[in-house]
Amino acid sequence: MRYSSGAVEALIEEFAKLPGIGRKTAQRLTMHVLHERRSEVEKLASALIDVKEKVIRCSVCQNITDLGVDPCHICTSAGRDRSVICVVESPTEVLAFEKTGHYKGLYHVLHGVISPLDGVGPDDIKVRELIARIGVDSTGGVREVVLALNPTVEGETTSLYISKLLKPLGINVTRIARGIPVGAELEFIDEATLSRAMEGRSAI
């Protein structure tokens, strides 16, 4: 059953395009927007536009940062251990590790994983930028790369690919411990488990 209003249906369809949002949830969100005050809806619309116009990727680590703050605050922080880079799939994993308060190294965000079935190859994610980043480190400061990708087939494939590229550079390549369930997404793992996984990392 579809609504007679074209505007309502259009908004439902747009909400339903979001990850994890089905039509029923999209309908509820649309009804909420309809019943909300205009000023609140305008705030939402403004926030959506701002996130596209004012958020960029850090030129060093590829994490998200505000326009005008590049490199990001993590890359420029004097308190970070610059000898270690933790490689993650998306910015949500950076936030997850930061919430633990234990990891003090740097990050590199791939923005995806290798997935041949989905047509995603190494050139479609930020692997090249990682290799170039380590290659231009003239001080030789990067000694370890921690692969913290989701425990999926795609994550494993990506980890092995990166490991093969880094080992000839003399980099110690490790992965977080296996205590995280296979198929789980790191952004939903609690802080204590993530901390133990990072502390228990092992060589590949």
Curated annotation (Swiss-Prot):
GO biological process: DNA recombination; DNA repair
CDD domains assigned to the protein according to its UniProt record, in alphabetical order: TOPRIM_recR (cd01025)
Zn finger residue spans: C4-type: 58-75
Keywords, in A-Z order: DNA damage, DNA recombination, DNA repair, Metal-binding, Zinc, Zinc-finger
SUPFAM superfamilies: Recombination protein RecR
Single GO molecular function: DNA binding
SMART domains, A to Z: TOPRIM
Pfam families noted in UniProt: RecR_C, RecR_HhH, Toprim_4
Domain of life: Bacteria
Domain Toprim: 83-181
InterPro entries linked: DNA_Rcmb_RecR, Rcmb_RecR, TOPRIM_dom, TOPRIM_RecR
PANTHER family (UniProt xref): RECOMBINATION PROTEIN RECR (PTHR30446:SF0)
Function statement: May play a role in DNA repair. It seems to be involved in an RecBC-independent recombinational process of DNA repair. It may act with RecF and RecO.
Family: Belongs to the RecR family.
UniProt name for this protein: Recombination protein RecR
